Amino acid sequence: MKTKEIRSLSTDELLAKEKQYKEELFNLRFQQATGQLENTARLSQVRKNIARIKTILSEKELEQN
């Protein structure tokens, strides 16, 4: 997910996306531990998406204050 797309989402949508990505990250780590994960690059993609969302959430919070 690109930063531009993330910025267009509302705060509630961002929180929902963050939760969704965290669940996906959990499942990917579980697959990696059991040796079933084929696309290991997806782990870093999901982690970076979570970081992008958290960054934009904190920016929005600072704008409000």
Curated annotation (Swiss-Prot):
Source superkingdom: Bacteria
GO cellular component, one term: cytosolic large ribosomal subunit
Keyword match Cell membrane: no
GO BP term, example: translation
GO MF, any single term: structural constituent of ribosome
Keywords of this entry: Ribonucleoprotein, Ribosomal protein
Presence of keyword Metal-binding: no
InterPro entries documented for this protein: Ribosomal_protein_uL29, Ribosomal_uL29, Ribosomal_uL29_CS, Ribosomal_uL29_sf
Protein family membership: Belongs to the universal ribosomal protein uL29 family.
Name of the protein: Large ribosomal subunit protein uL29
Native organism: Lactobacillus delbrueckii subsp. bulgaricus (strain ATCC 11842 / DSM 20081 / BCRC 10696 / JCM 1002 / NBRC 13953 / NCIMB 11778 / NCTC 12712 / WDCM 00102 / Lb 14)
Gene behind the chain: rpmC
